Amino acid sequence: MAASFSVPSMIMEEEGRFETEVAEVQAWWNSERFKLTRRPYSARDVVALRGSLKQSYGSNEMAKKLWTTLKTHQANGTASRTFGALDPVQVTMMAKHLDSIYVSGWQCSSTHTTTNEPGPDLADYPYDTVPNKVEHLFFAQQYHDRKQREARMSMSREERARTPYVDYLKPIIADGDTGFGGTTATVKLCKLFVERGAAGVHIEDQSSVTKKCGHMAGKVLVAVSEHINRLVAARLQFDVMGVETVLVARTDAVAATLIQTNVDTRDHQFILGATNPNLRGKSLANMLAEGMAAGKNGPQLQAIEDNWLAIAQLKTFSECVMDAIKSMNITEDEKRRRMNEWMNHSSYDKCLSNEQAREIAERLGLQNLFWDWDLPRTREGFYRFRGSVMAAIVRGWAFAPHADLIWMETSSPDMVECTRFAEGVKSMHPEIMLAYNLSPSFNWDASGMTDEHMRDFIPRIAKLGFCWQFITLAGFHADALVTDTFARDFARRGMLAYVEKIQREERNNGVDTLAHQKWSGANFYDRYLKTVQGGISSTAAMGKGVTEEQFKETWTRPGAGNIGSEGNLVVAKARM
């Protein structure tokens, strides 16, 4: 007879701690924060993936702050507006006026990769590039917050009352591109973002192999199910770390022309097929392969593809059915009846598979309908895709249970598109928040908008539910504009250009970089020196002799207004 096993107390304690943590996670998930979130895994799965050392992250506090900010905007029909920040200077200036910060993958790719090798937005930079930029900015935010506290606590109450308080700790939302590979790559990327300070992350539904900037051509989508896997992987990692990082699901389905696979039935309605029966057995890929075997290349191969596509009569299956019904030898009333029946059975919310759609078509009298989605596949094996707002809506329906915001990338600032997308997604997910890219890739002056329309665009689409809106590359463009115009003027007019265009404008607009030593924290670190040395230091950076004393006063030059002429005064003092 086998001896009974006596469970050691250590094992019981271990299981007790595990079960307690499982209950805590479940209670967390049941909170208002996650009432719209669907998870295909359990709290036990999450706790099993955690270590025994509990950790906390500053980014989690920022994530909670971001969530509150966005939900407040959603309730008020307003929007958090921001733009891509390049560096600590920009992020501290933005803090005075905006309530969130964006970190753009495009800007990082062009200006700040971890290999220092710049390039276009193809997500081919090392995957720690954007997390490192987040850390760069998050450290700066925390530093300027500490610096401000030291400065304010050195003031009297009256001085503090007169001095505006700046909340430097504005939540950062970062560009996660496509997740940078498979599930484990996405998990590790999201871990980095949390550790480096991101309050939110967006992930898009393009193929990671062929990823393009949202406003480039040649975009290839992944299946709906694959992108859901990315979102689930991100959420799982956030859960494992115990953080409430805001997750944004982006879709590029409006302008995409290709899709990796036809494995997901939710994509079937938008895949194109050849409808010309004369091409039966003559796939585009085979035609191109034959051309290459014959020694053709470049323009010759492009001509083969162009000619093939010109005669293929590419259509979605639904378009093919509707055209076939219109050409049937039946009465107009019967045509209308069959078209209505087709539309009722094949509406986008039903997400019919192609097999199901063919069965319905056959019931409508279309037994020998020719439509082949394999014939037009590219040399890489991609299927042709009919990008549209409706395709983005269908993806929004699928992504919403796994994300906090949905973002539809567009090719122009179009109110009609925005309205259709918002109403479409919210018809199934009325509480979901939406995001919008106020892209500098749009030629806004060519959009047909008046200046008034441009001014009102943000609040107008905010009322539709777009509660987070951002100019991805405004930091980049602002940096380029200021540098180019100043360099040109400086080359022509020397120091007068600097004084007129930079120094005086900093003073006139109250920009705190005018006193750049103070901005960089010289006073703050003097406090360290003096604290270590008993309250006095002969080597304090801001002691007697620092040139920044010149900026504590302004002088009025006759006829020039209160612009300051300390430059002349400095020269006079130097000659004394």
Curated annotation (Swiss-Prot):
Which InterPro entries does the record match to this protein? ICL/PEPM (IPR039556), Isocitrate_lyase (IPR006254), Isocitrate_lyase_ph_CS (IPR018523), Pyrv/PenolPyrv_kinase-like_dom (IPR015813), Pyrv_kinase-like_dom_sf (IPR040442)
Q: Which residues form a coiled coil?
A: none
Q: How does it assemble?
A: Homotetramer.
Catalyses which reaction(s): D-threo-isocitrate = glyoxylate + succinate
Q: Which cofactor is recorded for it?
A: Mg(2+)
Q: Which residue numbers does the motif Microbody targeting signal cover?
A: 574-576
Q: Just give the chief location class.
A: other
Q: Which residues bind substrate?
A: 104-106, 214-215, 250, 437-441, 472
Q: Name one GO molecular function term.
A: isocitrate lyase activity
* NCBIfam families hit by this protein: isocit_lyase
Q: Which residues form the active site?
A: 213 (proton acceptor)
Entry's EC annotation? 4.1.3.1
Q: What is the native source organism of this protein?
A: Gossypium hirsutum (Upland cotton)
A single Gene Ontology CC annotation of this entry is: glyoxysome
- Protein purpose: Involved in storage lipid mobilization during the growth of higher plant seedling.
- Protein name stated in the entry: Isocitrate lyase
